[in-house]
Amino acid sequence: MFYAHAFGGYDENLHAFPRISSTVANDVRKYSVVSVYNKKYNIVKNKYMWCNSQVNKRYIGALLPMFECNEYLQIGDPIHDLEGNQISIVTYRHKNYYALSGIGYESLDLCLEGVGIHHHVLETGNAVYGKVQHEYSTIKEKAKEMNALKPGPIIDYHVWIGDCVCQVTTVDVHGKEIMRMRFKRGAVLPIPNLVKVKVGEENDTINLSTSISALLNSGGGTIEVTSKEERVDYVLMKRLESIHHLWSVVYDHLNVVNGEERCYIHMHSSHQSPMLSTVKTNLYMKTMGACLQMDSMEALEYLSELKESGGRSPRPELQKFEYPDGVKDTESIERLAEEFFNRSELQAGESVKFGNSINVKHTSVSAKQLRTRIRQQLPSILSSFANTKGGYLFIGVDNNTHKVIGFTVGHDYLKLVERDIEKYIQKLPVVHFCKKKEDIKYACRFIKVYKPGDETTSTYVCAIKVERCCCAVFADWPESWYMDTSGSMKKYSPDEWVSHIKF
């Protein structure tokens, strides 16, 4: 029998190997072919995976053989030999490679009482001393420097995994290397497929949705859920209900299993979706009444059109046109907004002849809240204009009455606001499908607002004009993650995110 440590299967009375406890001590070095659900897979020659468990303050690590499999296998799936005998279960994974856990090659069994252990990828060409890696000359000088110190008790172990050699070093409190082991085998570190989340704490919903996204984008895995509250399963289901927007992606990839004090969410990635699992795309489009964030399918359609067309050409300039009073079509509103944008001064309380449209947005804010609102709202509003038809944002015009209000600030503060606007626009990520790769084109003006009889004023309306962009403008990086080999969750950049789309 084989028991996965990820599911609480560690038993000190059984044989223990990286990630599993078992009733038999199986030497997995002797196999060249294994079978999972009647499909055969070859063991990779001369390449291994360093796997470990940390259970009950015990570290169990070893170099294990691995096999290549392009299908998703879940933790605990049985692995058989060619005669049909079960020899292990699925534990660790690195991309399309799965470890075969049991008696492997070089191993490390430690008591973690009072010591830590760290794992590193050893970069090609680098040498190692203690807890650092660098080019050989730098490491040589480091070793000379540290040799002058007296050795102290070991406080940390460092496991270095390289393409041709693996090493284990130990260090004292000063970073002096106390001991070293070398294994003349090339290996990889697994992509961790177990994430621990506590519910009932601050940001638990964010942590849960982030973990779901990261695991689905990394081939699948398990989330171990604990809670201070008694009914962990009840609390978990409440949190899952609150992130229902993710269920369109994960509903058929998720299974919740109740344990005594914790729950396990088992997930697999079907690789059939054209999009990565994404909490928020941060791609916005402008409608008549609002700036709306695209969901994954809307983003796919929008980006597909851009990719097929190779980007968009600039919109032609508006032609001068005499229009009767009361006309409220989009083109007329845009012309009125252009005229308003070019005004040299405004009167407090005057009525603006146009309201919000697909090209125009009004907003009013106090001087005290001005920079905060710009930071919070500018990226989504301006990127939505850039992704649609371009447009105008007027800060200081009441959204309901359409009257000029403005905001009153000093000259120095106005310069800070201007720099903020420039900074936030320049930070907007653009993913290009065209050859020109042009920047976002915009103009910003501060129009003075006078009260009747005043000759001077410190009241302004901020007017920002954004042209339609050639390609896709993001308000921020998409909220879409993956697991790296260190066990950290990393967010995809916009370019990385788009590159993973199956157009």
Curated annotation (Swiss-Prot):
Its EC number is 3.1.-.-. One of its GO terms (molecular function) is 2',3'-cyclic GMP-AMP binding. It comes from the Viruses. It catalyses: 2',3'-cGAMP + H2O = Gp(2'-5')Ap(3') + H(+). It holds the Pfam family B3R. In some poxviruses, the poxin is expressed as a poxin-schlafen fusion protein. In the N-terminal section; belongs to the poxin family. Homodimer. This is Poxin-Schlafen. It comes from Monkeypox virus (strain Zaire-96-I-16). The lineage of its organism: Viruses, Varidnaviria, Bamfordvirae, Nucleocytoviricota, Pokkesviricetes. The gene is OPG188.
